[in-house]
């Protein structure tokens, strides 16, 4: 059976059973409720981002449940299944599992929990964060985060209303807030007399509240702020446009989703997921680097590049650029990525039955099952893309890793980014050698 089919079967079972049930004090968090339960809440939260196939996540379950029971009534304990709700972890750069984050007084700046994975240690850290929040409130600081620079004013659609997260946009602030922003924006261009705009207003506000901290929603009165409206050739109302981070006027895209808040949230969440950073392609210079990058991932992609003397810096950088491009295209899969120099890790190559003179080469490994697949096509953009696409669809032949489990990674020097150089040869002094001319 193909590697990915086994994985998908496993995921299908775990997604039904779940690592936590409704009987537990651990709250199941999803794309639909994360914003309202965590970000828009005054409660202190600790949230675990996990994958059902992750061994460390399974080991954490009993201690995490115990911590949730102990903190009941004091703080909230939640969990997000990243195989089902990837966009929730995207804004927080979740790369490995389990990842635990504490959402304290400032929900926009959660802190990483890196302590021991025991109920006592988890509870202690959450209580410490709760104490900070209490001190901040006693000192007159707000427990939430305001939408500074939102351009609030007397506009009818955004700004100063209580609980209204829709940003009022104008000719004066549009460029600074939207076009020069690192945030994702959805902007509604409306007219005060437009009936469809009035119908959309409560849905737009609800979506803005749900998406707070992930995607920003704005509204611009196109009958007043005509400079911006004309730039985007607004002719009908409402018109909704999407702006990715760092967009220019020409980069604006039309929104093509539904007009219920749930439709808007789902559409925007998908775009947020697309904008999550691609996983880094690490050089496998030691055991720790490889395990950190791969062990808790569904799959790990290994690239074996030619020796630096056979493929100098420009050549190698071209290969690395190609790998980074593919990691971007397949980032939603949350795979790990490793590259090593050919022949630098003979035990690893032997386990995969690659190497020798066959560089470059690529394999994909499931650490849990010790199953791998090998790229049989060309090591080029199209060949690699086809190989990875087949893996993501559950296609391709797999083999069992040779030997007794994953081999030990030899410690090597990190590549300095420079061309390789042949070792200098020692000059041989022939002056002391007396050769008879007749011997020449």
Swiss-Prot record:
Record-marked site positions (Contributes to redox potential value)? 55-56, 195-196
Q: Where in the cell is it found?
A: Endoplasmic reticulum lumen
Asked whether the keyword Transferase is assigned, the reply is: no
Q: Which reaction does it catalyse?
A: Catalyzes the rearrangement of -S-S- bonds in proteins
GO molecular-function annotation terms? protein disulfide isomerase activity; protein-disulfide reductase activity
Q: Which positions fall inside the Thioredoxin domain?
A: 19-131, 127-273
**InterPro entries named in the record:** PDI_thioredoxin-like_dom, Thioredoxin-like_sf, Thioredoxin_CS, Thioredoxin_domain
GO cellular component labels: endoplasmic reticulum; endoplasmic reticulum lumen
Identify the main location.
endoplasmic reticulum
SS bonds (residue pairs): 54-57, 194-197
The UniProt annotation puts the region (Disordered) at: 138-164, 404-426
PROSITE patterns per UniProt: THIOREDOXIN_1, THIOREDOXIN_2
Query: What UniProt keywords are attached to this protein's entry?
Result: Disulfide bond, Endoplasmic reticulum, Isomerase, Redox-active center, Repeat, Signal
Described function:
May function as a chaperone that inhibits aggregation of misfolded proteins. May negatively regulate the unfolded protein response (UPR) through binding to UPR sensors.
> What is the protein name given in its UniProt record?
Protein disulfide-isomerase A6 homolog
Task: State the organism of origin.
Answer: Caenorhabditis elegans
């Amino acid at each position: 059976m193909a590697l990915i089919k086994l994985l998908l079967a496993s995921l299908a079972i775990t997604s039904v059973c779940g690592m936590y049930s409704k009987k537990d004090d651990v709250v199941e968090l999803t794309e639909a409720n994360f914003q309202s339960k965590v970000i828009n809440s005054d409660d202190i939260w600790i949230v675990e981002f996990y994958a059902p196939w992750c061994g460390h996540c399974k080991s954490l379950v009993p201690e995490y449940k115990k911590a949730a029971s102990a903190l009941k009534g004091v703080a909230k304990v939640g969990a997000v299944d990243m195989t089902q709700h990837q966009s929730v972890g995207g804004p927080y750069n979740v790369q490995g599992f389990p990842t635990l984050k504490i959402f304290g007084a400032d929900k926009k700046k959660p802190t990483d929990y890196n302590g021991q994975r025991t109920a006592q240690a988890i509870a202690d850290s959450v209580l410490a964060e709760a104490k900070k929040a209490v001190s901040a409130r006693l000192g007159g600081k707000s427990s939430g985060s305001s939408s500074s620079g939102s351009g609030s004013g007397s506009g009818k659609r955004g700004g100063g209303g209580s609980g209204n997260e829709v940003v009022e946009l104008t000719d004066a602030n549009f460029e600074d807030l939207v076009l020069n922003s690192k945030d994702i924006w959805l902007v509604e261009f409306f007219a005060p007399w437009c009936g469809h705009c009035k119908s959309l207003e409560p849905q737009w506000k609800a979506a803005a509240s749900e998406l707070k901290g992930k995607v920003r929603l704005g509204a611009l009165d196109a009958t007043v702020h005509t400079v911006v409206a004309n730039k985007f050739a607004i002719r009908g109302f409402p018109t909704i446009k999407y702006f990715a981070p760092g967009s220019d006027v020409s980069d604006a895209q039309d929104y093509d989703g539904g007009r219920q808040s749930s439709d808007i949230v789902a559409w925007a969440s998908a775009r947020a997921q697309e904008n999550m950073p691609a996983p880094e392609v690490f050089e496998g210079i030691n055991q720790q680097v490889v395990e950190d990058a791969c062990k808790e991932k569904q799959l790990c992609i290994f690239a074996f590049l030619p020796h630096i003397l056979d493929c100098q810096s420009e050549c190698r950088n071209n290969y690395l650029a190609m790998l980074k491009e593919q990691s971007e295209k397949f980032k939603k899969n949350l795979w790990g990525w490793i590259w090593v120099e050919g022949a630098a890790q003979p035990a690893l190559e032997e386990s995969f039955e690659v190497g020798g003179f066959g560089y470059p080469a690529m394999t994909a490994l499931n650490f849990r099952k010790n199953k791998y697949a090998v790229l049989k096509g060309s090591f080029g953009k199209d060949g690699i893309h086809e190989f990875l696409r087949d893996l993501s669809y559950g296609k391709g032949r797999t083999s069992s890793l040779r030997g007794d489990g994953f081999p030990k990674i030899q410690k090597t020097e990190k590549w300095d980014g420079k061309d390789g150089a042949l070792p200098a040869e020692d000059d041989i002094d022939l002056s002391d050698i007396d050769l008879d001319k007749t011997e020449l």
